[in-house]
UniProtKB/Swiss-Prot annotation:
This is Nicotinamidase. SUPFAM superfamilies: Isochorismatase-like hydrolases. Disruption phenotype: The nadB-pncA double mutant can grow only in a minimal medium supplemented with niacin (nicotinamide or nicotinic acid). GO terms for molecular function: metal ion binding; nicotinamidase activity. Keywords: Hydrolase, Metal-binding, Pyridine nucleotide biosynthesis. The active site is at D18, K116, C161. Belongs to the isochorismatase family.
């Protein structure tokens, strides 16, 4: 059993990214082994007074779904007005079991759930900013209003939504940490290595849960 090393300071928040049925085994966009990180996330949650959860929440006709583009297959890439877009299998559709938070996730003190990807024509990876890089979720203001200047990020997937969230946190002036053993990656065509290059270049720091738990 893991024991707490110490309660994180009041200026720290835990951001839990997309720990949903759709991204865990049996889901429509399952990441291998993603359910295995949930016990660690639950333990980390007991160390923080401020916890934010993100939830992918797509309409059935979302622009990122390959099924909505004639002749396209999942994991093809298309160009949209805001840049390249990976096409995904339909996943985390609003109101479906696939979109629900994983039942093993146990974070009773979580204060805020941010639903993202609900705009039909814009994808959303980051907890802070939509993929068009103009539309804010309001999370940066929410955290700063509460005196938060440091965020620890966990969840799914390391190379997409976790990475975009961590980079945008750093851009927002927050100290940004990714807890590597509380995340799982898709790692598609070198995407994990590329994501870490981008994160480190943006000032994101990588740590282990052992830095918080013993």
């Amino acid at each position: 059993m893991l024991e707490l090393r110490m309660k994180q300071a009041n200026n720290c928040a835990l951001i839990v990214v997309d720990v949903q049925n759709g991204f865990t085994p049996g889901g429509n966009l399952a990441v291998a082994g993603a359910d295995q990180i949930i016990p660690c996330i639950n333990q980390l949650g007991t160390c923080f007074d401020t916890i934010v959860i993100t939830q992918d929440w797509h309409p059935h006709n979302h622009i990122s779904f390959a099924s909505n583009h004639l002749g396209k297959q999942p994991f093809d890439t298309i160009q949209l007005p805001y840049g390249p877009q990976v096409l995904w299998p339909s996943h985390c559709v609003q109101g479906t079991q696939d979109a629900e938070l994983h039942p093993a996730l146990d974070l009773p003190t979580a204060q805020l759930i941010i639903r993202k990807g609900f705009h039909r024509n814009i994808d959303s990876y980051s907890a802070f900013m939509e993929a068009d890089r103009h539309t804010s979720t309001g999370l940066a203001g929410y955290l700063k209003e509460r005196g938060i200047d440091t965020v620890y990020i966990v969840g799914i997937a390391t190379d997409f939504c976790v990475a975009w969230t961590a980079i945008d946190a750093s851009k927002a002036g927050l100290n940004s940490y990714v807890i590597i053993d509380a995340c799982k990656a898709i790692d598609m065509n070198g995407s994990l290595q590329h994501a870490w290059q981008e994160m480190l270049a943006s000032g994101v720091q990588r740590i282990s849960s052992r830095n918080i738990l013993v």
